[in-house]
Amino acid sequence: MDKKAARIRRATRARRKLQELGATRLVVHRTPRHIYAQVIAPNGSETLVAASTTEKAIIEQLKNTGNKEAAAVVGKIVAERALEKGIKSVSFDRSGFQYHGRVQALADAAREAGLQF
């Protein structure tokens, strides 16, 4: 099993448990150059809020989009957008990525901005 297949297996297991709970989830995906965050409805078919380092407004604020500072900006923005829509509590779905570095920075920034998980 290669590295990507193992990550997808971990993500699938976690998502199955979150779907059983019927929780709104904050999903994070990272690539070497960008980080993406989405708040997905409990049924899993609707994206309620999204933010990523590919957005023009976010790119203008940053020197580099593949670091912890960029992840923190995305976390803050996705939390603000979720709170505007009335979403206060979510479950964190790290998509099989280790809770470390950019994923942790995004989560911490979202918590500081008022999102609960």
Swiss-Prot record:
Pfam families: Ribosomal_L18p
The keyword rRNA-binding belongs to this UniProt entry's keyword annotation: yes
GO molecular function, one term: structural constituent of ribosome
Domain of life: Bacteria
Keyword Ribosomal protein: yes
Keywords, ordered alphabetically: Ribonucleoprotein, Ribosomal protein, RNA-binding, rRNA-binding
CDD domains: Ribosomal_L18_L5e (cd00432)
Gene3D superfamilies cross-referenced by the UniProt entry: 3.30.420.100
Family: Belongs to the universal ribosomal protein uL18 family.
Name of this chain's protein: Large ribosomal subunit protein uL18
Source organism per UniProt: Proteus mirabilis (strain HI4320)
Taxonomy of the source species: Bacteria, Pseudomonadati, Pseudomonadota, Gammaproteobacteria, Enterobacterales
Gene assigned in the entry: rplR
